[in-house]
A protein has these predicted regions:
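Histidine/acidic-residue-rich catalytic or RNA/ligand-binding cores of hydrolases
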Residues: 84-86, 116, 227-234, 268-285, ...
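Histidine-centered divalent metal-coordination motifs
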Residues: 23, 67, 74-81, 220, ...
């Protein structure tokens, strides 16, 4: 049975008498040599560390002879809603992959503000097992990286000036994010024309607001000049490697003065054409990941483009120089980007560090205490010491001496509670998607009854469009309870703009519309329109959709569910797995299309 179906059984109960881990090689996360010791856990904290600790009544004893106890690993750069090999999102499997690799803290850059509350609700309740999530809200500049995928300003909030940054941060902080991600650097690696970048005053305005709220700022920074901008603005970390030029003394001095750390995400830049996998590493991958890599390894090697070879050499040298210069360096991977797999990539990143000038102990410290410090949480977690949070894992062997032993995870603890790893492994090996909480639909979707801009379902309507900097733009307002949409089409050959009405907050959890016959609404407009159903476990390009027409006057449109079609002939419409309804406006490049909508509802 999938771990998610078991709820809190995937996270063991708090032991009333505590947990005593005996005779482990304890790597405390600081980089100091591991030593034999016992560790006593009480509640969610480490109570004591030492030799010969006494076992009080009711304590659970774990014999850790031959094993190493470590603080949980961090991944400071993930996209948990992306699986790393294409396909629909499966948060439960992404979370599971991190836990089985000993990653107890993951920073997620793949969410929008509306997603934070429902994700926290289902993970903190135990409905879906997860590491300690640090959910980030994204900011960027118009025409910059992060804004070109067609996901809308709600997903990457745009801030071209310090004043706009203040407004964007007002919106962002209302969602209580754990971190702020800023797409500050527009270099696209020389493959395509550069995008726009953020200036120092705007970035500094974001940093000041975030730090006042106790929140770290991590930037998408990939160039030497962009790194100087970020360090001058006082960001907590550069969230990628500098790949265009060798770092200079000026940057090192700026980073040391501002306390800006370096999270180079070497795993995403490592040329994949000739990369190899250790047997233990390959064994721990999910079946589709393993199949992809085995198929690649069975083929003749593809050539590595000269651009990638040159960038990789620069990244390696910059990692060495920044380490030698005394800059703090943490672990992040960009997990979820093609071929950078959830969970396993964090261990691979640690291994890569040991190939480029780090000892095993230094690389492990980067993944534990240093990364916790980058998140401004070093006083609370990231080390094995009395008073620290008990996010820990046990590994067979001595990874502080032989880094490959890091794949031999035996036990994982989150806040002092042991994680059941076997159900998580079964979940990863299953073809099924993780069960998520579902909400029964009552009928109304957006009838105009609310006056706060939200739908009847208390969700926020948002605009999306085709990818590209020259994309379409949708503006919508409410007039007399109706939604009025006006789209200015972009320069793409087949431009479109869409209004997304989430059926649950952030379209994360599921909507159950079983028992209804279809969707009805009132519409007026003379353009080309379609209604699509965003569904769990289906790729966006394959969402079920039905075309519809409008007219010069408002009229009711009813679309039965059996009229919706998918581009994937194998796809099946599951009315218990809906997430959003999407009204799509299509037109000619540079044209304008409008649509008026009202009384949107499921009908029986």
């Amino acid at each position: 049975m999938a771990c998610a179906l078991l709820g809190l059984l995937c996270l063991g109960a708090v032991q009333p008498g505590g947990i005593l881990i005996r005779s482990a090689h304890v790597f405390d996360g600081t980089g100091a040599p591991a030593g034999l010791a016992d560790v006593l856990i009480s509640g969610d904290r480490i109570e004591a560390v030492g030799r010969g600790l006494r076992a009080r009544r009711g304590v659970r004893i774990i014999d850790a002879r031959g094993m190493t106890l470590m603080p949980g690993l961090h991944d400071l750069h993930t996209h948990l809603r992306s699986p790393g090999l294409g396909g629909p999102d499966d948060l439960g499997k992404a979370y599971a992959a991190h836990l089985i690799h000993g990653v107890t803290t993951a920073v997620d850059f793949s969410v929008s503000g509306e997603m934070l509350a429902p994700i926290r609700e289902m993970t903190e309740s135990g409905a879906v097992s997860a590491p300690r999530l640090q959910l980030a809200i994204r900011l960027g500049v118009p025409g910059g990286h992060g804004t070109e995928r067609g996901w809308g300003d709600f997903f990457t909030m745009e801030a071209p000036t310090p004043a706009a940054a203040e407004l964007a941060m007002n919106r962002a902080l209302a969602y209580r994010p754990d971190a702020i991600k800023v797409f500050a650097d527009g270099w696209r690696y020389g493959r395509v024309p550069d995008l726009n970048s953020m200036n120092v005053p705007t970035l500094r305005a974001i940093v000041v607001r975030a730090h006042a709220a106790g929140i770290p700022v991590i930037t998408h920074t990939v160039t030497l000049e962009g790194a100087k901008v970020a360090a001058s603005a006082g960001v907590d970390a550069l969230g990628h490697g500098i790949g265009d030029a060798i770092v200079d003394d000026e940057l090192i001095a700026l980073m040391r003065a501002s306390g800006t750390a370096y999270v180079p995400t070497m795993a995403v830049y490592e040329p994949q054409q000739d990369r190899s996998f250790l047997p233990a590493e390959l064994r721990l991958l999910a079946p589709p990941e393993r199949a992809r890599e085995e198929a690649r390894l069975a083929r003749p090697l593809d050539p590595i483009p000269e651009l990638e070879t040159r960038r990789w050499a620069i990244l390696i040298e910059n990692l060495r120089r920044l380490k030698a210069g005394g800059v703090r360096i943490g672990i992040g991977t960009d997990a979820g980007i093609g071929g950078v797999y959830q969970g396993s990539s964090a261990v691979r990143e640690v291994r890569l560090f040991t190939q480029f000038g780090f000892t095993s102990a230094q690389a492990l410290a980067a993944a534990t205490s240093v990364s916790a410090g980058i998140l401004r949480q070093g006083a609370d977690r990231g080390r094995i010491a009395a008073g620290q949070r008990a996010d820990l894992f046990l590994v067979a062997g001595r990874p502080d001496r032989r880094i490959e032993d890091l794949y031999e995870v035996r036990r994982v603890f989150l806040a002092g509670r042991e994680v059941a790893l076997a159900p998580l492994r079964r979940l990863l090996d299953s073809d099924e998607f993780t069960p998520l909480p579902a909400h029964r639909m009552a009928g109304p979707i957006d009838t105009g009854a609310r006056t706060d801009g939200r739908t009847d379902l208390d969700t926020l309507p948002v605009a999306t469009n085709e990818a590209g900097i020259d994309h379409s733009r949708l503006h919508f307002t409410r007039e007399g309870g109706r939604l009025v949409l006006v789209a200015r089409m972009g320069a793409a050959a087949r431009p479109f703009a869409s209004l997304v009405l989430p059926l649950t907050r952030g379209a994360v959890q599921l909507a159950d519309a079983r028992g209804f016959a279809g969707i009805a609404f009132e519409a007026r407009g003379t353009g080309r329109y379609a209604l699509a159903l965003e569904s769990y476990a289906i790729n966006a390009r394959d969402f079920f959709r039905a075309d519809f027409g409008g007219g010069t006057t408002m009229r009711e449109v009813r679309i039965p569910f059996d009229q919706f079609r998918s581009a994937d002939p194998a796809a099946r419409l599951d009315l218990a797995r809906l997430r959003a309804v999407i009204f799509r406006l299509e037109g000619e490049p540079g044209g304008q299309v409008s649509l008026e909508l009202g009384n949107i509802r499921f009908y029986r």
